[in-house]
Amino acid sequence: MDTFKVQLQEFFSAGDGADDAPCLDAPNLLEHQKRGIEWMRRRERRGRPHGGVLADDMGLGKTLSVMRLIANDGDDAHKTLIVCPLSLLNHWTAEAKKHNLPLNLRQFHGGDLDESFDDAKAVAITYDTLRAHHKHYKTAGRASGLLARHWHRVVLDEAHVIKNHQTGVHAAACALSADNRWCITGTPIHNRHWDMYAIIHFLRCRPFDNVGVWRMLNRNNDTNRIKSVVNKIVLKRNKAEIALDIPQHDVQDVHVRFDEAEARVYNELKSASQRAYDDAVASADKAGGMQDVLWLLCRLRQVCCHPALTKCAAMFPEHAHIFEPAYESSKCRRALELVQRVLDTPDDKVVLVSQWVEFLQLVAGLLRRRGVPILLYTGQLRVEERTAVENQFNAADSPYRVLLMSIKCGGVGLNLTGGNHIIMLEPHWNPQIELQAQDRIHRMGQKKRTYVYKMIVDEENSIERYMKARQDKKLTFVNKVFDRTALNYEDIKKFFSL
């Protein structure tokens, strides 16, 4: 208990007071970026742990802030290791060159860190490369390469990748040795407080990196106690409070109603889902039964978009026509109306987002039949092809004013400020992923007012209506956690009866 009390006191008392570091040499930065870098430097010198979470809204220049932090290291400092998704690896290199920063940033794809990396101030790798090294380490029984080196700083970009603390990628990140540990993500919490625990465990944020302490802290889902920890180690600013010159951002729900045939198909699949659920509850093989339920729930979501996605045409021969790819479902018709409205406004562009590539391809076919030139941005594209699509869409003189994007590809590192409208074709279980996609257009560099249209089938028993309610509940929880009013050290001591 004495150790626990000491760790608790150190956590809440460290990091306060003036910084004795020399003035920051960071030209061409915005004021919020300068303040952010000073906060990071202060945490590296005085914080417990040494590091934290930079969680500014997407599009506020977190990457450049971190690179400026690295650039201001002394020449005698050890290297910084940057871990990021594959889609962002070239982005880090390009940004360093664009801003002429003396990082000599090198990409590492495996093997050993030989002498060719000696002059690099920063090394960038992917999460997959890190995980592979850790897997080899566990097999060989000894550290090598990345894991054998002690780093001055480790930076996890899009750190929510490690949000499950029971995964291999989380274990690999935690195995890295470093003086300073940083998580960069606009969305530290996606669904639940355990997402935050995974980050705290990586940061070695004692005593809260102990799973038992964290579980007790979150007893009864009391967000006040979580906030007391989060506020100490997280810097999170949104676009509104920074008052950047980013035009207004409007979000609206677009309600869709089924036609008669779609309603019939939906209701029959809904009844089948209910029967499958009842059978699963009564079955000895609950896990297998619940897989059937989840499959049917996915079909319900797909019916809301286009019946053809369900592959259930044989069940409804009397409504075979609505399962044809050329059929304009109720949601497709409404989406096409929104697209046409954008195209009727000179120079405006629109991004359509879905989690199903097949649905994007259906919508693309409907648009092509109307003579609309379109671009597709999905995981099927190579990295260089993605860059080409991004540049084509953003170009002022481009004939392409409509881009269809997989939500999985639209979450990280993508700048689509050439567009100013975005249509979310269906709700996602994780609202943070939706927000990431929306911020592809609403970010620094945007010159126009932006519009988000969230399409929802608003029938009484619609799964999309249920998902919308779940999203609102999750966002309320996240907003409470990052609210800056929180318990203090004395409050936390009382809770743990110290």
UniProtKB/Swiss-Prot annotation:
Gene3D superfamilies: P-loop containing nucleotide triphosphate hydrolases (3.40.50.300), Tandem AAA-ATPase domain (3.40.50.10810). Its EC number is 3.6.4.-. SUPFAM superfamilies: P-loop containing nucleoside triphosphate hydrolases (SSF52540). A motif (DEAH box) lies at residues 157-160. InterPro entries: Helicase_ATP-bd (IPR014001), Helicase_C-like (IPR001650), P-loop_NTPase (IPR027417), SNF2-like_sf (IPR038718), SNF2/RAD54-like_C (IPR049730), SNF2_N (IPR000330), SNF2_RAD54_helicase_TF (IPR050628). GO terms for biological process: DNA repair. Residues 337-493 form the Helicase C-terminal domain. The keyword Transmembrane helix does not apply. One of its GO terms (molecular function) is ATP binding. It is an enzyme of class 3 (hydrolase). Keywords: ATP-binding, Helicase, Hydrolase, Nucleotide-binding. Residues 43-206 form the Helicase ATP-binding domain. Pfam families: Helicase_C, SNF2-rel_dom. ATP binds at residues 55-63. Belongs to the SNF2/RAD54 helicase family. This is Probable global transactivator. It comes from Orgyia pseudotsugata multicapsid polyhedrosis virus (OpMNPV).
